[in-house]
Amino acid sequence: MIVRMKNTFRMLLAAMLLSLFALPGYSWQKSFPEKDYVAYLFTYFTGNSGDEEAVRYAVSMDGYTYWALNDNEPVIDSKVISSTGGVRDPHILRCEDGKTFYMVVTDMVSANGWSSNRAMVLLKSTDLVNWSHSVINIQKRYSGQEDLKRVWAPQTIYDPEAGKYMVYWSMLHGDGADVIYYAYANAEFTDLEGEPKPLFLPENGKSCIDGDIVYKDGVFHLFYKTEGHGNGIKVATTRSLTSGAWTEEPDYKQQTKEAVEGAGTFKLIGQDKYILMYDVYLKGSYQF
């Protein structure tokens, strides 16, 4: 099924979005000419009730100051694309071909409880306006998931060793810790291939959520939130995504004493500099 936006908004997007730099995911293997990038696209949701749990767009010319599009209203109807009626944690990746975009979102209505969801949604587009979508319910899709409590914050990255797109997300089973898992998407980006496997868990065995992976100079950098033990953003690195050989950095990366989550890291256009942004969720704002 193809989800289409309202005509007035589609006209605006058609004029500008294809030359935007989608945040925070981007291709690591192929170097698309940065001269073709003119702005940054930010996808987000705004809260925990009603249509706040829906995909929105904002744009920026400098990577720091963003203007909401569509009067800060949803650009995709959550009730159409999800099984729960709400979506959270949107992430867009520009694919290796430079013209296809993958979006993944948490299929969840938080009013039903923080351990109520079992699914994510995979979306695909070539214009950032019209999206096909597929709901992946992990508990229904795979056996042995009877004690699954939640499926949170999926993201996508291209794995050069596998030659496939990896979807990774955090899951909680029973009374255990939230662990970041992964599975590869099929060629159509409509389903996952193989069983979900653990991608990362801190050496202390405690929960981690909101993984965000960025590749630079042969190294994959995983930014994650330490859930329930420090509640901040840390980083682990590896040269092979599925090797299990992660090196953890001990320090927290946020520059605030407030509780934070939802790290997103992206490169500034035309510069060898990166921005780490995160959600100061008790304040209702983002910080860089």
For the regions a protein language model found, what residue spans apply to each?
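Carbohydrate-active catalytic/glycan-binding domains of CAZyme proteins
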Residues: 28-288
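Sec/Tat signal peptide C-region and signal peptidase I cleavage site
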Residues: 24-26
